[in-house]
Amino acid sequence: VKIPNVVITGANGYIGKVLADKLPDAKRYDINNWDIKSPRGIILPTVTCVVHLAALVRVGESVRDPLKYYSTNVGGTINVMRAFPNAKMVFASTGAAFHPDSPYGHSKVMCEQIIKDTCKEYTIFRFYNVGGGSPTNPEGLPLGIEKAKKTGTFTVYGDDYDTKDGTCVRDYIHVDDITDALVRAVREPAAMTDYEPLGSGRSHTVKEYLETYQEKYGKQFDIVYGDRRPGDLPVSEVPFVSEFMTPKKTLEDIV
């Protein structure tokens, strides 16, 4: 299958680096220091596909500074569409868009609607909790575990949710599985659906994630239970697994 002329926004990020390595035959556009928030009059009508990954993604930060998230995520998406007017859009949304309870989630829902109203071809992916190692990021661990490796203490935000152990439930998906789905979306016709959930279909609590990590590596952290974080969803599970997705990795592979 011929690879289209591809632009990846956020190509220097965790997911973007892995995706770029999986598209070796794609024609690359090296657009140096382009900030999606500040368009410089770039218009490239020959680009046939944009994988739009660039965004701000911290739920707590979005609650503290919502305008930052709306200007970057929504305004930036509009700028991307103006820069590549003829491109198929492959958009990275979020599982939080199912029940948005933060400016981050709301910003992604807005982007989804703008894309549907504007783009002739689009595939909207709702990402769940991406993790796992890759050549560009050998560990790919959540910030909480990265911090715990240094301090010996892991903070769980909220232990009184209506879940089996009181902690949040998440669908963890490996970065390799996510980027395989993105490659398919680049190569194949646009889905033109409301959304395509990119998750494993297997849910785990935050505590289960932590226990799996500790068991795999023989580490023990002191667990501190903090207050719930504003904007955190108690449960984030996929309603179905997208046909673009063939999950191969387990939670043990991700940690």
What spans do the regions from the language model cover?
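Adenosine-cofactor binding site in Rossmann-like domains, unifying the SAM/SAH pocket
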Residues: 26-42
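NAD(P)H-binding glycine-rich loop region in Rossmannoid oxidoreductase-like domains
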Residues: 40-72, 96
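Conserved C-terminal active-site "lid" loop/helix of NAD(P)H-dependent oxidoreductases
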Residues: 42, 175, 208, 225-249
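NAD(P)-cofactor binding segment of oxidoreductase domains
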Residues: 50, 64-89, 109, 113-114
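Conserved Rossmann-fold NAD(P)-dependent oxidoreductase catalytic core, especially the SDR/UDP-sugar
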Residues: 52, 78-105, 122-125
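C-terminal "lid/loop" region of Rossmann-like NAD(P)-dependent oxidoreductases
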Residues: 159-161, 193-197, 204-211, 218-235
